[in-house]
């Protein structure tokens, strides 16, 4: 059934005794990503989890021209060259693994973090006024407003 | 064009007259969005103050900058649970967040984080008095299907001339609770009464300011009509209802619009309409003409929200205890009404009016506490028939009638001591409103409002009145006792409404018997 072990999750960020300075030194030594930038504890695993799947590599993927045309239309990616086609085939083959996992009697998950409790934040204003910075990202602004094409308005106006 | 309409009306009317009389029923369901009172937003640390300068309460997360993540505000969960408990809901041990996608300029993410599959709470029930002018008050119960937490969107201003929208993201991410009620209502008055009661409850809980003018409480109504016994009709949704009064008007308008449409052989289409308060009508809106696919999906950035349902549990940093929150729920309006009926022996309707106007209730409780010898009936009559009526006449919100409890107490004290009469008390309500700094005794002196109770003065007025109203005197002496009112009225007029009417009536009876 559901097998989630505590070690899958980032222990450092969820621990209350976490000391930033200590951790920084550790990162320098281990040359790992700097997680101290997270403002709040996370429930997301911070290290990849190795998993063993059966490799269906012998199932060679064949795609007919009609499907390729459809995929090109949908993705706007040109699949004309042999290399592009090979990449597509290997991608499908890679994803195909998932279809061979036995999921009998396993309740579907909405999220892999389902057994985790959501972290809560105290009701405090900690940020907000970055207007100049954020408005700079917009193409059209007017007097501190973002400007967009007209939205839904009553028909008779 | 005009003549065409006339012809068509004439052509359809006879048909209607011959058609068997069919009974139509209207069905109304409400969705209420209530802004949860909080310092910061639902998932970010920016402020929620109303009227903050444009785009200044916006974090990177609210502006949907890549790499930002939501962190849930604890207070919003607590407020949601409290509200759910007050409305008799089942709070769910595990609830989840979902993304609801739609494309709109004031929604920078392209989706709203809401709760669809597993909401915070379900299956509540609200029972409330329905007040229809000129009809008897009755109680109505409506099922509350779901209470969910969700983000608000930004605010768009539509610039008609330049054909563009101006977007302010201050409201984007502000915490809301959406309350979805079952379509158990029938009329606009019932809907308005439900919202009125909800406002009272949320204000007591302090989970929502309910300031509709600030958009802190928004009501959408789903309205359909169907023949008795037939399945429900196609519904329309009316949005943009900005006040409690508009709720009843908008829904009544929409029901009548649908009835007229069907009577003329038309068909109601599923559409979103907007309430035009100025012209008092609903107007079709351009968007959402086709059923939208919101492409709901689980919010991958938020694990499920757990709460502790164990009785007697306490809240911890990680886990909120529902049992602990249930202890924080104050007395609810319906309980107050019952207490008023039991403790002060008020009738049910008086209790409803007092509770529905929190200011009146405060005045009542404070006045009865310090003026124990004034009968409660005198106090409630004064507050409801005189003070509230005065405010309604001026179209003034009772909350804006600023006067101290003490001033009202002084008026009632003078009234009870027969120092002034009811006419003078009414005049004082107006005088206190226009001269808020003057004391009641000053005003009585300045405006010469003392009641005349001296027997000799009253007898003089009575003699005069008897002389003036000889016809009424004759009628009275022939046995028409009601004619006495005409003579008493004359005394009131002669004394500039200042005579003590109790003594006047006694005096007149005595004089006329002779």
Curated annotation (Swiss-Prot), chain A:
Catalysed reaction, written as an equation: L-glutamyl-tRNA(Gln) + L-glutamine + ATP + H2O = L-glutaminyl-tRNA(Gln) + L-glutamate + ADP + phosphate + H(+)
GO annotations of cellular component type: glutamyl-tRNA(Gln) amidotransferase complex; mitochondrion
Keyword Metal-binding: no
Enzyme Commission number, as recorded: 6.3.5.-
Keyword Acetylation in annotation: no
Broad class of where this protein is predominantly found: mitochondrion
Molecular functions per Gene Ontology: ATP binding; glutaminyl-tRNA synthase (glutamine-hydrolyzing) activity
Compartment annotation: Mitochondrion
Enzyme class: ligase
Record's keyword terms, sorted: ATP-binding, Ligase, Mitochondrion, Nucleotide-binding, Protein biosynthesis
SUPFAM superfamilies in the cross-refs: Glu-tRNAGln amidotransferase C subunit
GO biological process: glutaminyl-tRNAGln biosynthesis via transamidation; mitochondrial translation; regulation of translational fidelity
Subunit composition and interactions: Subunit of the heterotrimeric GatCAB amidotransferase (AdT) complex, composed of A, B and C subunits.
Miscellaneous comment: This protein may be expected to contain an N-terminal transit peptide but none has been predicted.
Similarity field: Belongs to the GatC family.
Task of the protein: Allows the formation of correctly charged Gln-tRNA(Gln) through the transamidation of misacylated Glu-tRNA(Gln) in the mitochondria. The reaction takes place in the presence of glutamine and ATP through an activated gamma-phospho-Glu-tRNA(Gln).
Listed name of the protein: Glutamyl-tRNA(Gln) amidotransferase subunit C, mitochondrial
Organism: Drosophila virilis (Fruit fly)
